[in-house]
């Protein structure tokens, strides 16, 4: 039997419903506020200087800049695999690489900047990571033109300097996921997640398998590698695969568009991607549109949809600037002048 309520009762119920809904909304917004502030707090704990220095300008001037000859040799260099068949020719050392990057000087700079003991311990892990993996990054730069600074900064950020569980378990330092097979996609579409197995996921050489790690979904699988250098090689594949510039997920255009050792105006590229990225040219770096090559490359990654974080490109810039990773890029280019 349908019951009718008086106008007063209806108004009272409506009011209670309104305030209940308002309270729920406040709780959601409050939660988002706390989450965002918690993220900013965590982000601020990273061992990074959030103020850009003139060290890059000084460093570039100290080495006499990068000549047009070096740039031409580097970007037109034939680096087909057979060039590295001999052990002594497997990397940039063949051109007499001399880097000015030093762990001790970086740590001294950060100590002088007022880093706490906790941040200095974290910074020590970061410089140790850079020292251990700079050769892998330089080899990929030599072969495929992706700046070593970009590769290292991404790895530092995405694997917490190799300390994340995923990095320790799989040697996957860039969070590269395995793809769903057609069979796996059917199971996911039917929400039969408990039926998913490792063999339902696809991985690409040099990956040797997959690892179940909860990211967006509990069933996510990530690629696993024999070594960290294989992880760098796989990441470079992703950044240099043939694609159509202007499309989300296409990164290969970045490395030719923003050559090492120069400043670049990101305006034109940012406008091409603006509809997809939602970021205007002047919004990438607080109104600054002409930036060092590594900042332009970081912006290019963000333009093309590499990361969902709104400040991903800025974090990459800060990491490269804080740890002076540009010194590795310049060393390789200077080696091309000989």
Question: What annotation goes with each model-predicted range?
Answer:
Residues 2-157, 161-338:
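Catalytic cores of secreted/periplasmic lytic hydrolases that degrade extracellular macromolecules
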